[in-house]
Amino acid sequence: MNIPHYSLETLAHLVQGELFGDEHFNLSGLASLEQAQSHHISFVNGEKYVEAAKQSKAGALIVTSAFKDQLPASQNYIVVKNPYLAFAQLTHVFEKKMTQRGIESTAKIHPSAMIADNAYIGHYVIIGAECVVGENTVILAHSFLGDNVEIGRDGFVESNVSLLQGTKIKDRVRIHANTVIGSEGFGFAPYQGKWHRIVQLGTVQIGHDVRIGSNCSIDRGALDDTIIEDGVIIDNLVQIAHNVRIGSNTAIAAKCGIAGSTVIGKNCILAGACGVVGHITITDNVTLTGMSMVTKSISEAGTYSSGTALMENNQWKRTIVRFRQLADVPLTQIMKRLDHIQTQIESLESTFKLRK
């Protein structure tokens, strides 16, 4: 297999960096500081990595000007303002891209479906009636597209993905293995001790430049659509219920669950294992730390927490006991005790001042 090589000059130009060293030096991959060899380029993304960079065998380093001044003058450098961003940009250069195009013989495609000539449809893919697959989009083996599904250009659908009836996906969207989009929402009407199923008549709309991880579920709406706006990134094992709306450029980490008809604003961050109840609104620019449970709307931007951090087990037990005891003490009584303690402290402070 021919491994592509890129000159240091070419890579510096791609990340709009300033080159120091041998401009013709060829590199064939990215690697960590610890594992890099002479044909690799690595990056320094913080003061704590400077010592590792001094010991690294990398052929070149991406650094800030401040870090460059702390490292050997003999090394090759690309100097940028944000090394981590430059690293992210170069991962696309060194990515092993899939160049295969066409439709595999085992794929089953409805005659009414429209597939771009330069798309790729993998083995045993099933594509239903009136579907549209855009230019340069890749759909890997065993994926399923129900009727009236649309995928824009430059998309990537990994193996065993199910895109159910009516799902609409725009350009440059990546969907990873075993994810299901457009499944039936969890809607039931309780009556006389039984649950009566509500048919989910909406669908799912996904904007441009969205990334959805593996084993996610995004349910279609009951009446209106479930909407994922442009630039949203979703980790693995995330559940998004019917009629949810996720604002543009929001990031959702693994194991989050968002209940039905909730609206999450733009540029939000949901750290791992957050839970969000249904029918609430979270404004723009909100960060929820790990394992937070959101039970009411959030109207002001900021960082919010409700998860309990790790502590030694015996300490945790004592804390839980005290926490339960708080519920049995009226708030007015707690306030009186605090006022009494404050009075005692002030009295002691006055006594010490007089003695001085």
Curated annotation (Swiss-Prot):
One GO cellular component term noted in the UniProt record for this chain: membrane
Reactions catalysed, as given in the entry: a UDP-3-O-[(3R)-3-hydroxyacyl]-alpha-D-glucosamine + a (3R)-hydroxyacyl-[ACP] = a UDP-2-N,3-O-bis[(3R)-3-hydroxyacyl]-alpha-D-glucosamine + holo-[ACP] + H(+)
EC number assigned by the record: 2.3.1.191
Keywords: Acyltransferase, Lipid A biosynthesis, Lipid biosynthesis, Lipid metabolism, Repeat, Transferase
GO molecular function: N-acyltransferase activity
Gene3D superfamilies referenced in this protein's UniProt entry, alphabetically: 1.20.5.170, Hexapeptide repeat proteins (2.160.10.10), MurE/MurF, N-terminal domain (3.40.1390.10)
Gene Ontology biological process terms from the UniProt entry: lipid A biosynthetic process
Active site, UniProt feature: H242
Pathway(s) of this molecule: Bacterial outer membrane biogenesis; LPS lipid A biosynthesis
Origin superkingdom: Bacteria
Assembly and oligomerization: Homotrimer.
Similarity comment: Belongs to the transferase hexapeptide repeat family. LpxD subfamily.
Function description: Catalyzes the N-acylation of UDP-3-O-acylglucosamine using 3-hydroxyacyl-ACP as the acyl donor. Is involved in the biosynthesis of lipid A, a phosphorylated glycolipid that anchors the lipopolysaccharide to the outer membrane of the cell.
Protein name (Swiss-Prot/TrEMBL): UDP-3-O-acylglucosamine N-acyltransferase
Record gene name: lpxD
